[in-house]
């Protein structure tokens, strides 16, 4: 088993290029963040065009298959049982309801269907329904992704045997900032689950949330962690905090949109073959800022009116923006010639 390791923070001055072999110290990533904006965007677009069609964006739809009542205390999350957000816990959806939602997602142009459950980890009694969902969605011709919390080795193997394409398990933030957001799950717990997913042969979807009050260096620490996973994730969702009433982070000041765009660009440069996804919080960006995100190297986004328990730009707005920018929806496996 390849054991993911926490990357140490280093403060020495560094060159602009990534040290061989593909190793990004936090100081390297900070240096990218601090480039003049136009230089950073130019470099990110160059890297993007080396590996991807710059005018193709993959569309994913996310469905909450089990909402609320989560044992974890993630400070950003409305689904935590530790927070009073007015969200009621629900049981796991039945398979037919999930497949109906997947059919609707495909009809709306999505090529990947992601299923999220709010719990610390799935129980064995859940696995038959979960694997049936995976098989059913794949039969519709969609890529499959699940985010179910921590996994045991056997659970990862069961999902792999069912044909799961991607498993999402975010690092959320840097190791240094992590303790200010979450106390019920360790950073190493997250890394261990990523190892189990890799060992089972499932592609990794792993990113984080920015705008939680972290510093730029701590944002760089998240990107460093992601880029130094061996290998780095095939799919990297970047979330812009949605400050939900009733959560500990409800009063957090919004992140400067240009800092969000910078984060997309830095993710593209440090993980050149990854699919970089605009995820939660996209509604907070106007059309011009979303266009900048695509220029910075984002080539996937969550598509649909709801992301778990937060709103998302309406599909008609997305289609209109694509038309204005000359962007087309693309199948995930057709995005890159080199991925």
Curated annotation (Swiss-Prot):
Q: Can you name one GO molecular function term for this protein?
A: 2 iron, 2 sulfur cluster binding
InterPro entries, per the entry: Aldolase_TIM, BATS_dom, Biotin_synth/BioAB, Biotin_synthase, Elp3/MiaA/NifB-like_rSAM, rSAM
Q: By its UniProt entry, which Pfam families does this protein fall under? A: BATS, Radical_SAM
Which reaction is the catalytic activity of this chain?
(4R,5S)-dethiobiotin + (sulfur carrier)-SH + 2 reduced [2Fe-2S]-[ferredoxin] + 2 S-adenosyl-L-methionine = (sulfur carrier)-H + biotin + 2 5'-deoxyadenosine + 2 L-methionine + 2 oxidized [2Fe-2S]-[ferredoxin]
Cite the Radical SAM core domain residue spans from the record: 55-282
Query: Mind telling me which CDD domains this protein's record contains?
Result: Radical_SAM (cd01335)
In this chain, [2Fe-2S] cluster is annotated as bound at 114, 145, 205, 277
What does the entry comment about cofactor binding? Binds 1 [4Fe-4S] cluster. The cluster is coordinated with 3 cysteines and an exchangeable S-adenosyl-L-methionine. Binds 1 [2Fe-2S] cluster. The cluster is coordinated with 3 cysteines and 1 arginine.
What EC number(s) does this enzyme carry? 2.8.1.6
Please provide the record's keywords in A-Z order: 2Fe-2S, 4Fe-4S, Biotin biosynthesis, Iron, Iron-sulfur, Metal-binding, S-adenosyl-L-methionine, Transferase
Q: Which SMART domains match?
A: BATS, Elp3
Cofactor(s) needed: [4Fe-4S] cluster; [2Fe-2S] cluster
Q: Which GO terms describe its biological process?
A: biotin biosynthetic process
Q: Which residues are involved in binding [4Fe-4S] cluster?
A: 70, 74, 77
Pathway named in the protein's UniProt entry: Cofactor biosynthesis; biotin biosynthesis; biotin from 7,8-diaminononanoate: step 2/2
Keyword Metal-binding tagged? yes
Q: Does the keyword Phosphoprotein apply?
A: no
Q: What does this protein do?
A: Catalyzes the conversion of dethiobiotin (DTB) to biotin by the insertion of a sulfur atom into dethiobiotin via a radical-based mechanism.
How does this chain assemble?
Answer: Homodimer.
Q: Which family does it belong to?
A: Belongs to the radical SAM superfamily. Biotin synthase family.
Q: What HAMAP family does the entry give?
A: BioB
Tell me which NCBIfam families the record gives.
bioB (TIGR00433)
Name used for this protein in its record: Biotin synthase
The organism named in the record is Burkholderia cenocepacia (strain ATCC BAA-245 / DSM 16553 / LMG 16656 / NCTC 13227 / J2315 / CF5610)
Taxonomic lineage of the native organism: Bacteria, Pseudomonadati, Pseudomonadota, Betaproteobacteria, Burkholderiales
């Amino acid at each position: 088993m390849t054991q993911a390791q926490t990357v140490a923070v280093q403060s020495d001055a560094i060159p602009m290029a990534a040290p061989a072999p593909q190793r990004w110290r936090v100081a390297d990533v900070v240096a990218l963040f601090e480039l003049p904006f136009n230089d950073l965007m130019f470099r990110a677009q160059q890297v993007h065009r080396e590996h991807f069609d710059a005018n193709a964006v993959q569309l994913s739809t996310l469905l909450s298959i089990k909402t609320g009542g989560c044992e974890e205390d993630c400070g950003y999350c409305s689904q935590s049982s530790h927070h009073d957000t007015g969200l009621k816990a629900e049981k796991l959806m039945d398979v037919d309801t999930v497949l109906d939602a997947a059919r609707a997602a495909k009809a709306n142009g999505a090529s990947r269907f992601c299923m999220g459950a709010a719990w610390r980890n799935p129980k064995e009694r859940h696995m038959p329904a979960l694997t049936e969902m995976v098989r059913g969605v794949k039969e519709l011709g969609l890529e499959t992704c699940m985010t179910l919390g921590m996994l045991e080795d056997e659970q990862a193997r069961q999902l792999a045997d069912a044909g799961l394409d991607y498993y999402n398990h975010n690092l959320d933030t840097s190791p240094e900032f992590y303790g200010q957001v979450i106390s019920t799950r360790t950073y190493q717990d997250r890394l261990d689950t990523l190892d189990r997913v890799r060992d089972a042969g499932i592609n990794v979807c792993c990113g984080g949330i920015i705008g939680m009050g972290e510093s730029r260096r701590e944002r760089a620490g998240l990107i460093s962690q992601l880029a130094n996973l061996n290998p780095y994730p095939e799919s990297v969702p970047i979330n812009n905090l949605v400050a939900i009433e009733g959560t500990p982070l409800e009063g957090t000041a919004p992140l400067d949109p240009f800092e969000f765009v910078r984060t997309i660009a830095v993710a593209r440069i440090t993980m050149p073959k990854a699919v970089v996804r605009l995820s939660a919080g996209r509604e907070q960006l106007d059309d011009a800022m979303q266009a900048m995100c695509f220029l910075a190297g984002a080539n996937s986004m969550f598509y649909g009116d709801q992301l778990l328990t937060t709103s998302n730009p309406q599909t008609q707005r997305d289609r209109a923006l694509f038309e204005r920018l000359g962007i087309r929806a693309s199948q995930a496996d057709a995005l890159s010639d080199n991925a």
